[in-house]
Amino acid sequence: ISAVRNFSSNSSVKPKIILHVAQLQNSDWWANGVTSQAGVTDFDILGLSHYFLWSTVNKNTDITKTISDLTTKYKKKVMIVETAYPWTSQSADGYNNIISGQNAVDGYPVTKEGQLKYMTDLTQAMISGGGVGMIYWEPCWITSNLKDQWNTGSSWENNTFFDFTGKPLPVIKYMKHRYTF
């Protein structure tokens, strides 16, 4: 944090400092530990990962309340800085997908339209709670010839903004949706 602040003092660039925690159910406990116990308060934004598969906070009303409570309690801006939702249960390669179509959230089928609805509703829930931004995790991580120690391809290509041929999916529209502020 001090390195960023030192850089900012001598630059026209003023980066924001985000502290990032995984999953909404951990956010208050973690932020309390960081601020009250460790005394770290010099940051601008509390960043949250939200993956429905690993979260116990999945109802939009609960997401809104969690973000609102964090904003009020810690007097910091809050963003969802990692999220994703699958558009298909299929795979374009032999690499097992991390999030499969069998893990759908009620009301959000694992389809192109379901992915768009999920992202639109999640973004509105975040905004309704006072959140200031949404970042989608790896929207371009389509299959490729990339080989890692586990396999060749992508374990995420069913969560991207592009189909298996590279064509943009409807989910991109969530960024231009008219939200209620």
For each predicted feature, which ranges?
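Aromatic-rich peripheral "rim/lid" segments of glycoside hydrolase catalytic domains that contact
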Residues: Q90-D121, A125, G129, W137-F181
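Short secondary-structure transition/capping segments
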Residues: L19-A22, T56-T72, N97-Q102, T123, ...
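Sec/Tat-exported extracytoplasmic proteins
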Residues: V4-S8, V21, A38, H50, ...
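A general structural detector for well-ordered alpha-helical segments in enzyme core domains, enriched
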Residues: I1-V4, G33-V34, D62-L70, Y118, ...
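Acidic (Asp/Glu)-rich catalytic clusters
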Residues: N10, V34-D42, D69-K73, I127-S128
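Aromatic-lined carbohydrate-recognition surfaces of secreted/lumenal glycan-active proteins
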Residues: I1-W30, K76-Y85, G133-P139
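Aromatic- and acid-rich polysaccharide-binding/catalytic face
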Residues: L19-Q23, W30-T61, K65, K77-T88
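A beta-strand-loop signature enriched in Asp, Gly, Thr, and Trp
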Residues: K59-T111
